[in-house]
């Protein structure tokens, strides 16, 4: 239990520091680099899930966890060996109450992701999909790659606030498709993942530009949204349209908040 707690703390600390460092390392391309960073997160998360299943079946659960921890250990040792002058100072952590809308949007982003992704298998099984077919639907997460990578490109040209609003308009369209029969339902989930990761990249980039205090609080709010999703989704197992309605209300709230600012 202690090891799992430490693992979770480390998993939250790394992105908080990373998104705070990006504007310092790449001041002229902060939005683009933040988008690429989030695309890497999507790819790594997807590969981790796939490899975990394959390795656990072939080697065992403990051996799979050990194998997957080796790249993180190697990167940690590499970072320890870097000269101190290569890393710009972050400065003191400042906690800005004006960033409350940003924290709220962070919570909404992961809530929508996990809340609907956890409910989708039950909906698909009710519609007659086989378990193997349900598993393939989760390849939709791969569409978060172009969504994340394009977010910085669009933010640099349209402005981050406008791009953020466009992303959540796309989320609302995707939620509407979830209420339709297949194949529209599957297309809606694909679009949902793409637009959620677009918005997530922009929100992460905005948090990073405000310093380590804001970026750390943003990451904490993000994971809090995921925790709430895990607690809430069992209440909607047989009420998928109602769950989509809740998701639409939260997406509309995020659209109205639009906390991403050009800096």
Pin down the residues of each PLM region:
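Cytoplasmic helix-loop-helix junction between adjacent transmembrane helices
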Residues: 3-41
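Helix-loop-helix hairpin linking two adjacent transmembrane segments in secondary transporters
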Residues: 28, 35-83
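Short hydrophobic/small-residue motifs within alpha-helical transmembrane segments
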Residues: 42-43, 141-143, 223-224
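Juxtamembrane intracellular "pre-TM" segments in multi-pass secondary transporters
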Residues: 82-105
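Extracytoplasmic gate region of multi-pass secondary transporters
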Residues: 99-148
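Helix-to-loop junctions at the C-terminal end of transmembrane segments
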Residues: 147-160, 237
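C-terminal transmembrane helical hairpin of 12-TM major facilitator-type secondary transporters
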Residues: 161-203
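A late C-terminal transmembrane helix in Major Facilitator Superfamily
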Residues: 210-240, 247
């Amino acid at each position: 239990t202690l090891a799992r707690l430490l693992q979770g703390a480390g998993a939250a600390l790394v992105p908080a520091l990373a998104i705070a460092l990006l504007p310092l390392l790449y001041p002229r391309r902060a939005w683009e680099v933040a988008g690429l960073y989030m695309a890497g997160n999507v790819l790594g998360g997807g590969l981790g899930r796939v490899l975990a299943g394959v390795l656990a079946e072939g080697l065992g659960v403990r051996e799979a966890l050990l194998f997957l921890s080796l790249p993180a250990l190697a990167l940690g040792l590499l970072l320890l060996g870097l000269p101190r002058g290569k890393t710009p100072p972050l400065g003191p952590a400042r906690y800005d109450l004006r960033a409350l809308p940003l924290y709220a949007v962070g919570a909404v982003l992961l809530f929508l992701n996990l809340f609907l992704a956890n409910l989708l298998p039950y909906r698909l099984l009710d519609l007659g999909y086989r378990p193997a077919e349900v598993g393939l639907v989760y390849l939709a997460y791969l569409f978060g790659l172009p969504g994340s990578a394009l977010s910085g490109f669009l933010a640099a040209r349209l402005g981050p606030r406008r791009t953020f609003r466009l992303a959540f308009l796309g989320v609302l369209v995707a939620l509407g498709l979830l209420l339709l029969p297949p194949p529209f339902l599957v297309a809606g989930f694909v679009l949902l993942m793409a637009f959620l990761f677009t918005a997530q990249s922009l929100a992460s980039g905005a948090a990073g530009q405000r310093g380590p205090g804001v970026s750390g609080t943003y990451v904490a709010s993000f994971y809090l949204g995921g925790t709430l999703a895990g607690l809430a989704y069992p209440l909607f197992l047989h009420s998928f349209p109602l769950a989509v309605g809740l998701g639409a209300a939260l997406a509309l709230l995020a659209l109205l908040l639009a906390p991403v600012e050009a800096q």
